[in-house]
Amino acid sequence: MKIEALSLAEMRTHRSEKWRGFPSDVLPLFVAEMDFPVAKPIQDILIEMVSHSDMGYLSSIPELGNAFAGFAKRRWNWDVIPEQVRLCTDVGVGMVEVLRVTTQPGDKVLINSPIYQNFYNWIKETKVELIDVPFKQEGLNWSLDFDAIEKVYAAGLKVHAICHPHNPLGRIFSREELTRIADLAKQYGVTVISDEIHAPLTFPGKEFLPFLAVSQHAAEVGICVTSASKAFNIAGLKSALIVSQSKEQHELLATMPISVHFRSSILGAFAAVEAFNKCDDWLDGALVTIESNAHYLKTLLDTQIPAAKYKIPECSYLAWVDVSALSLGDDPFQVFLDKGRVAFNAGKIYGPSANQFIRINLATSESVLAEAVNRMAKSL
């Protein structure tokens, strides 16, 4: 069943960053949160816990490992070991804490730009050296430069941090790509940290393969960081997962401070249990809406701004739009904001090669998307 977005009037009463980040005359389609109502099982557990004043300190929560393992098996046929699912505050904290146990200051960490902007912040926070091997771009298609990647691996790389599925490109790495990364990592002694927060948002008919499930090598070299937050629209509840498949990685993660677990939210942890156990139907409905919106945005752009180029993503609710042909200068985001009063994400925050792109949030209503494109057109 299709999930209907809340009205714009309702959304403007919300207190999150999306609705407080810009003046009220700006239409916001930037930060990755949805305009959809939270699934009822999640609402129910939160109401139950709050109404019973059940908001104390978080203890152990084996329910979460079991819930994620069940979800991973249903959605991706991944055999997760529940005891090797660890809790953390959010994916950003998870990435930082994993970097802290897999690197020393000055070690080299590889990313592939354009990439979610906080990868740069996480690497800076842990005082390691950023190495960037950008994607190769051919039109609207992006591919990994494996020759350059192997050279970096061979030169003494410690960690390769990947975003799978990819934000902002909206693509899912293939089995062949993931296998090659895993084989190279095994050969050169590199740890692969895979941010898989967008994985539950894979579109029907597309295949997501968890990195740790791709091969024995992947299980040995990989660590996954993920959360229910993106797919179930509960980012403010602060709960995420760090998952390992091998005994060695599990033992390494056990050296993290115990506080990594206890800094998480008890409400967020139990909301995630409900999300993974009881919200498949809601998620499927959200995906129907998001994929429909992805096609609707393409129709709007093709009709009103045909020079803007956009490829339907394979996952998630983030559209990656090439506006280079519109001649908007070095910062198209600012032109749309100043002239159209519509806020997207500026491509330049994802990497130096992406300044002529914008990222548009699709998890809204058709009417909001139509108004956004109308404001874009009026900016030209």
Located regions from the model:
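Conserved glycine-rich beta-strand-loop-beta hairpin in the small C-terminal domain of fold type I
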Residues: 273, 290-298, 310-323
